[in-house]
Amino acid sequence: MTQKITVLYAVLLSMALWGCGGGGSSDSVSDKVWYVVGVSIPMSNTTPRSCKLDVDTFADTCADGEFLLDHTTPATFTLTRVDTNTDPGTLALENYTIQYVPMNPNSPVIPSLTVYHTQQLKEGDNTVTLEVMDVERKTTFAALFNSGQQSMTILPVGYTAAYTFNGHNSYGQSWTYHAQAPIFVGEYNECVPCN
């Protein structure tokens, strides 16, 4: 069975809704609310394990060898126009940072990752391939266990992948929003690679 977990619904503001100081809102471009943004990441609880958010950090010895690649997953960014009488333009996703927040404070620290990825987002559903963890972080994580600094008995280790997305809209204004998803990092001992 596959379930879709919505990790964020937020009103995306191009700039502050209210002016500083006295007075109310204005009708300038900088004060508009253009879209309501939803971000969803598909998750699966099927057997065998899901390749969506289970991150395999160990390259196993298989007939052909297990490939150790950057781990990615598809995400759907849904943009719903707030005012149907105006042209909201598009949003450009320019980069995002992932903070790996351990579910157990005694878990190994995984350094944050910044990904420079430019993609135009338009009204409706937009599929974006998100990095979950790159090979550098996978091999650093695995080295802690291979060297004996961490015990294999704690695997898999749960983290919250906290994403901060940054970009600009068609009017050149900056925007930022946040989403998060649980990931489980470990040794899955499978010879069918997940990328």
Which residues does each PLM region occupy?
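C-terminal motif of bacterial Sec signal peptides marking the signal peptidase cleavage site
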Residues: 16-19
